[in-house]
């Protein structure tokens, strides 16, 4: 997207907030299944997702941070540029930073789970672009040009007897 391109060509500022337990500043991130930090939630018996238990797990001390700490964290936060070589300022702020009483972490998790459970690509795309504030990327297979080149075939230069035209592409 144009916005993502503009952000990539900026100093890429993210709002970093201090952990109420260890004090280390970090940007809020979506936890995901492969990370041991970030926005997460508990599962109940039988692996049932419990979005109402949403919390943030510190990237550094791994403490569970309840949403009630978010206001004091936000007040002590600061914008930090990841790419200081650029003069152009760019800001990234996902909805995880919404003030308490607006959009809760539980609502964000619930929306995500509904989009995944329904298998609704439109809902998931909307969630990624509005809640994570990131461009949505379809599952794309990257082609290995070396493998394609290795499979090339060498054809002779003989034109069939009755051939009148040769087309190559």
Residue ranges and their predicted role:
Residues 1-147, 152-169:
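Short, flexible loop motifs at catalytic/binding sites
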């Amino acid at each position: 997207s144009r916005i993502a391109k503009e952000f990539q060509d900026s100093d890429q500022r993210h709002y970093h907030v201090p952990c109420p337990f260890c004090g280390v500043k970090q940007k809020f991130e979506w936890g995901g299944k492969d990370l041991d930090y970030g926005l997460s939630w508990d599962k109940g018996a039988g692996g049932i997702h419990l979005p109402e238990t949403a919390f943030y797990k510190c990237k550094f001390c791994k403490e569970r941070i309840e949403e009630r700490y978010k206001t004091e964290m936000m007040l002590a936060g600061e914008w930090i540029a990841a790419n200081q070589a650029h003069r152009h300022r760019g800001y990234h702020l996902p909805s995880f930073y919404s003030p308490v009483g607006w959009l809760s972490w539980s609502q964000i998790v619930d929306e995500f789970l509904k989009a995944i459970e329904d298998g609704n690509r439109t809902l998931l795309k909307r969630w990624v672009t509005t809640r994570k504030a990131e461009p949505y990327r379809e599952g794309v297979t990257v082609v290995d040009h070396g493998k394609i080149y290795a499979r090339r075939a060498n054809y002779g230069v003989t034109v069939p007897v009755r051939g009148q035209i040769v087309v190559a592409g």
